[in-house]
Swiss-Prot record:
No activity in the presence of Ca(2+) or Zn(2+). This is 3'-5' ssDNA/RNA exonuclease TatD. A divalent metal cation binds at residues 91, 127, 152. PANTHER family: DEOXYRIBONUCLEASE TATDN1, TATD FAMILY DEOXYRIBONUCLEASE.
Length: 260
């Protein structure tokens, strides 16, 4: 099983990053996609992907950091995307929940990254929170120019999920679905996601599954917890976990064009 969203550049992994990666593979994870959320972290993600086997990375600027976007950023992302470890542009998108960057800054950076991905024929790794309508309005003109797209860490509604799938967008599901307080709506729509459009991820070190036992004392999520998330998703979808792991692995290979 492949974890499509690991924030391995996080300072929470600074002291034991090697062990975190080793534990993930020991647990049955067979590949990691390391998320780039700004230029510096995208550069670090690429270096980590080169350092560890069966790891790849994204290059992009998260909506929170969109105020940093400028011509030099764009040039650096394009240069970074030429590295073989980098297999997607992002994390890019819109987040109108907290607006760490203004909506205008977010939209400018998002469209610029969609253009880069289209020009380079690379898939996009996307983020959307409290911005679905505007997100789709900006994205739709680019979809026929992109080889693929995934909306990672999906936490939206049934209607939003169906709109994404209708446009061929992959849906990334995290341990959010294991949260009995805020993940129930997502849990209910799991069976509606076509298996050929489903991807799984931890978003580590964030979103530690609430039903994980025993819980780590650090409360830090790790890619080694992906098998737990997979098992729960398979249970709620009424599918065999091994079949779902193989299916989502095939989806990863199709979307990102990688072999593992």
């Amino acid at each position: 099983m492949f974890d499509i969203g690991v924030n391995l550049t996080s300072s929470q992994f600074a002291k034991d990053r090697d062990d975190v990666v080793a534990c993930a593979f020991d647990a049955g994870v067979n590949g990691l996609l390391i998320t780039g959320t700004n230029l510096r972290e995208s550069q670090q993600a690429q270096k980590l992907a080169r350092q560890y086997s069966s790891c790849w990375s994204t290059a992009g600027v998260h909506p929170h950091d969109s105020s940093q976007w400028q011509a030099a950023t764009e040039e650096a992302i394009i240069e970074l995307a030429a590295q073989p470890e980098v297999v997607a542009i992002g994390e890019c998108g819109l987040d109108f929940n907290r607006n760490f960057s203004t909506p205008e800054e977010q939209e400018r950076a998002f469209v610029a990254q969609l253009r880069i991905a289209a020009d380079l024929n690379m898939p996009v790794f996307m983020h959307c929170r409290d911005a679905h309508e505007r997100f789709m309005t900006l994205l739709e003109p680019w979809l026929d120019k992109l080889p693929g797209a995934v909306l990672h860490c999906f936490t939206g509604t049934r209607e939003e999920m169906q709109a994404c799938v209708a446009h061929g967008i992959y849906i990334g599901i995290t341990g959010w679905v294991c949260d009995e307080r805020r993940g129930l709506e997502l849990r209910e729509l799991l069976p509606l996601i076509p298996a050929e459009k489903l991807l799984i991820e931890t978003d580590a070190p964030y979103l530690l599954p609430r039903d994980l036992t025993p819980k780590p004392s650090s409360r830090r999520n790790e890619p080694a917890h992906l098998p737990h998330i997979l098992q729960r998703i398979a249970h709620w979808r009424g599918e065999d976990a091994a079949w779902l792991a193989a299916t989502t692995d095939a989806n990863v290979k199709t979307l990102f064009g990688i072999a593992f």
